[in-house]
Amino acid sequence: ADASLPPVDALWLPGGYPELHGPALAANTAMREALRAFHADDKPILAECGGMLYLQDHLTELDGTTHAMMGLIPGDGIMRDRGGCQGMQTAPLPEGDIRGHAHHRTRTEDGPTPIAHGRRARHPAPGEPIVRDRRLTATYLHLFFGANPPAVARLFGATSI
């Protein structure tokens, strides 16, 4: 497991399956401290799905085993044995609308108040929550960067496009 971040100006945590690596993620204190320092330096971070789960307080597996995660985003990710929200949504971000999709097998409890919810194309119910803490943006949505490249550039800190 990596113990440090490379020299970068922004981070994208695109997901994966943190539930398969809970003990290793919890034990990697060097990387956890590096991510905390990156966030404290107010650099842009986009965390999607599993990346968002990694940044929450805890992740609980189906058998009830709970692992400490980063604690940068309040809340707990809890595995469930069936799929959650699925389908295309648009993320209405301050930087601009960006299309994406959701597919996950967790739910989040005790999370922060979202800045927005994804908009579903064919369903009136609110989509996935989108949370923000300074320059950290987190959501279950997997964003399609090609949908709005200028908005993505602004999300990652570009000042001119």
Residue ranges and their predicted role:
Residues 1, 34-35, 55, 126-128:
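Generic recognition of flexible, low-complexity loop/linker segments
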Residues 1-5, 26-29:
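A general structural motif
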Residues 2, 8-13, 54:
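Helical hairpin unit composed of two closely spaced alpha helices linked by a short loop
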Residues 7-8, 41-43, 66-68, 97, ...:
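Short coil/turn connectors at secondary-structure junctions
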Residues 12-14, 46, 138-140:
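Structural motif
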Residues 18-92:
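Cysteine-nucleophile active-site neighborhood
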Residues 77-161:
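Amide-donor transfer/coupling interface in amidating biosynthetic enzymes
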